[in-house]
Design a protein with these regions (language model features):
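N-terminal Rossmann-like NAD(P)+-binding domain of SDR-like oxidoreductases, especially those catalyzing
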Residues: 1-205, 255, 338, 343-346, ...
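C-terminal substrate-binding subdomain of Rossmann-fold SDR/epimerase-dehydratase oxidoreductases
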Residues: 2-6, 31, 60-63, 147, ...
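Alpha-helix N-cap/helix-start motif
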Residues: 15, 42, 92, 208-212, ...
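Acidic donor-diphosphate engagement hotspot in glycosyltransferases and nucleotidyltransferases
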Residues: 18, 139-140, 210, 215, ...
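A general lysine-centric signal
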Residues: 36, 179, 214, 319-321
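Short aromatic-enriched loop/helix-cap "lid" or pocket-rim segments at secondary-structure transitions
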Residues: 43-46, 139-143, 210-213, 277-279, ...
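The catalytic Tyr-centered alpha-helix of NAD(P)H-dependent dehydrogenases
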Residues: 171-178, 208, 212, 216, ...
Length: 369
């Protein structure tokens, strides 16, 4: 094999798309997928490539340094794409220690295993850390409506400011604080030891295989089962959305051509207020299910806002386009159509993961709001 790449969290939402892309695009690479298989990790996400000769799955915890040391030695790993993380803000508010353990100590353990194994022989090595735009804090909502596309109140900017690679960190949730800390550790390992590193910060992803604690698959599933659609506060918060396969393509480009020790922002230039996004989802699901227009609108239920709910995230990814030629390939309207169709056509996948522990979590999060 030409290279051996360790991808952590490869059974999760974004990770499974990255694993699939690398396994199929680079048959001369050996791809080692390390995943703990927590509630959000699902090997069914990779059923189509699990028998590929250049793919290996290893179950393990990134906080287990001894296991990581053995893994680097066993597979002679020369590149890391680190996606394994706890990522849901609501869960971080309820259980910040788990987020600190996985996102901070797990990243540190992985860095240390790589540093020890590579032992200063940095040529051909790379530690690529995937992070979030939430580390930057929040932006002001200075335009009540975005530059509407097709009459929708979404798609265009809701303010003058955007997160750039120079934006100072100002995390507001335990989740974003844990990711900010892990980002700093990655950069510190470059500055202190000379390890070749890269960090990227991405906006909200959507698409197939996303665990239904996140807004889009949650609401598709709730509409299907005629359950309430819980909207935090008035639903005025704004997020920038990127189709997950476009994110995977960006990771590929940056891993192979990015400048060592640099940071790249990955975004969709595609801002939507939560309430407007939800209405698009409602209309799309109703249309694809053959429901009369407006059937599911009445399921929208405003609930108590999340503590410390940031108003607006918006990524400026022009550096990535300018230096490496990447830009999103999918417009939001096309992406949300593909996404809704996928979940409706893969109801068994959804049913399999929305049982047991997930149902208990869902009730604990929303029953009293």
């Amino acid at each position: 094999m030409k290279r051996t790449i360790l991808i952590t969290g490869g059974a999760g939402f974004i990770g499974s798309h990255v694993v699939r892309l690398f396994v199929t695009k680079y048959p001369d690479y050996r791809i080692v997928n390390l995943d703990k298989l927590t509630y959000a990790g699902n090997l069914a996400n990779l059923r189509d490539i699990e028998d590929s000769p250049n793919y290996v799955f290893e179950k393990g915890d990134i906080c287990d340094l001894d296991m990581l040391r053995a893994l680097f030695g066993q597979y002679d790993i020369d590149g890391v794409i680190h996606l394994a993380a706890e990522s849901h803000v609501d869960r971080s508010i309820r259980d910040p220690f788990t987020f600190a353990r996985t996102n901070v100590l797990g990243t540190l353990s992985l860095l240390e295993a790589a540093r020890e194994y590579w032992d200063g022989k940095w040529e051909g090595k790379l530690f690529y850390h995937i992070s979030t735009d939430e580390v930057y804090g929040a932006l002001e909502l200075t335009r009540p409506e975005g530059d509407a596309a097709g009459g929708e109140s979404g798609g265009g900017p809701f303010g003058e400011e955007f997160f750039t690679e120079e934006t100072k960190y100002a995390p507001h949730s335990p989740y974003s604080a844990s990711k900010a800390s892990s980002d700093h550790f990655v950069r510190a390992y470059h500055d202190t030891y000379g390890m070749p590193t890269l960090v990227t910060n991405c906006s909200n992803n959507y698409g197939p295989y996303q665990f239904p604690e996140k807004l889009i698959p949650l609401f598709i599933n709730n509409i299907r089962h005629r359950k309430p659609l819980p909207v935090y506060g008035r639903g005025e918060n704004v997020r920038d959305w990127l189709y997950v396969e476009d994110h995977a393509r960006a990771i590929d480009v940056i891993f192979h051509r990015g400048k060592v020790a640099d940071t790249y922002n990955i975004g969709g230039f595609n801002e939507w207020k939560n309430i407007d996004l939800i209405r698009v989802i409602v209309r799309t699901v109703d249309r694809l299910l053959g429901n009369p227009e407006g059937t599911s609108e009445k399921l929208i239920t405003h609930v108590t806002d999340r503590a410390g709910h940031d108003m607006r995230y918006a990524i400026d990814s022009r550096k990535l386009k300018r230096e490496l030629g990447w830009q999103p390939s999918l417009q939001f309207e096309e992406g949300i159509e593909k996404t809704v169709r996928w979940y409706l056509q893969n109801q068994k996948w959804m049913d399999d993961i929305t049982s047991g522990e997930y149902q208990e979590y869902y009730q604990s999060m929303y029953k009293d709001r």
